[in-house]
């Protein structure tokens, strides 16, 4: 894993990777506790808001020929916009007005692209239905030790159970919050990104993932928080996915190769109360997802 300080180079030099063991193999060998992941497919009443943002997103994205790196660069760097404008107007030295108009057009599309991109993310990450279902899960698992993963601290603070561990706290208070939770037998700790990796918390058996992206590494690290080996433990992971959004594609990419059970919000209560239910077929909404 790369580090910002570059010290991963020492690991590569003196202790290179000689073998890899994935979660499935480690579980089969008994090194980790077994777990069930539930993909909770959520249908929301206000999906039209997302679809409008999505339409706007692709309108602007197409201007950049669906080149995500180019679109993002033009949104943040004026030099990149000038560079693109010169490509679109090769005779820019003799056509200054045309060059200026093209540069302005690039800026409009770049800002619109970024605005729609952030709008889609906000819709997905902050949807109140996720808070509602999280509280339902935690209400039914008050005899367990649970952790939630939100994309933002703001969402984590809205959850009705447990404490929040965030970068807003002082380091001392954060350590105290974490140590108290480690010592507890049951309870809830709500986090954003602080415990994605490197945290060893005994007794965890339930994870609720409200916000994620397409990274398989982050997904594996979060699951890893609740599958540390313990006798007679079967961990539960609930991952929320809003139907009809790019979150379906993020889930597919982040969960590739892993087993999961698809349910909807109507099945969730059956799962929580131990009743029989019929899993949904693992079919994605038929949409073209680029980003």
What kind of feature is each model-predicted range?
Residues 76, 84-97, 263-291:
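Long, largely alpha-helical accessory region at the distal end of helicase-like NTP-driven motors
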Residues 14-17, 32-37, 202-206, 231-237:
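Short glycine-/polar-rich loops that comprise or flank the Walker A/P-loop
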Residues 32-110:
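Inter-lobe connector of SF1/SF2 helicase motors
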Residues 145-150, 154-199, 218-220:
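Conserved helicase ATPase core of P-loop NTP-dependent helicases/translocases
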Residues 49-65, 112-158:
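Conserved interdomain hinge at the start of the Helicase C-terminal
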Residues 188-190, 196-213, 218-221, 234-241:
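A short beta-strand element within the Helicase C-terminal
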Residues 225-255:
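Conserved segment of the helicase C-terminal RecA-like domain
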Residues 1-37:
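Post-DEXD/H (motif II) to motif III coupling segment of the RecA-like Helicase ATP-binding lobe
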């Amino acid at each position: 894993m790369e580090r910002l300080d570059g010290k991963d180079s020492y690991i590569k030099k003196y202790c290179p990777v000689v073998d890899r063991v994935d979660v499935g193999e480690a579980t089969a060998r008994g090194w980790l506790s077994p777990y069930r992941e539930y993909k909770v497919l959520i249908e929301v009443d206000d999906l039209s808001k997302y679809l409008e943002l999505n339409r706007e997103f692709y309108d602007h994205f197409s201007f950049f020929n669906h080149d995500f790196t180019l679109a993002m660069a033009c949104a943040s760097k004026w030099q990149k916009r000038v560079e693109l404008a010169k490509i679109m107007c090769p005779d820019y030295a003799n056509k200054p007005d045309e060059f200026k108009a093209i540069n302005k057009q690039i800026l409009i599309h770049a800002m619109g692209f970024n605005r729609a991109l952030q709008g889609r993310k906000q819709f997905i990450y902050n949807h109140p239905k996720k808070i509602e279902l999280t509280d339902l899960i935690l209400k039914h698992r008050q005899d367990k030790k649970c952790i939630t993963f939100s994309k933002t601290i703001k969402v984590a603070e809205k959850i009705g159970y447990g404490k929040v561990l965030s970068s807003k706290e002082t380091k001392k208070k954060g350590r105290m919050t974490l140590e108290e939770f480690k010592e507890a037998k049951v309870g809830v700790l709500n986090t954003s990104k602080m415990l994605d990796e490197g945290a060893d918390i005994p007794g965890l058996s339930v994870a609720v993932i409200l916000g994620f992206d397409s990274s398989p590494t982050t997904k594996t690290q979060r699951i890893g928080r609740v599958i540390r080996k313990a006798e007679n433990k079967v961990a539960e992971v609930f991952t929320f996915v809003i139907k009809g959004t790019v979150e379906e594609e993020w889930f597919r990419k982040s969960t590739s190769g892993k087993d999961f059970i698809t349910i909807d919000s109507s099945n969730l209560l059956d799962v929580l109360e131990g009743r029989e239910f019929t899993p949904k077929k693992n079919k994605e909404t038929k949409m073209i997802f680029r980003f």
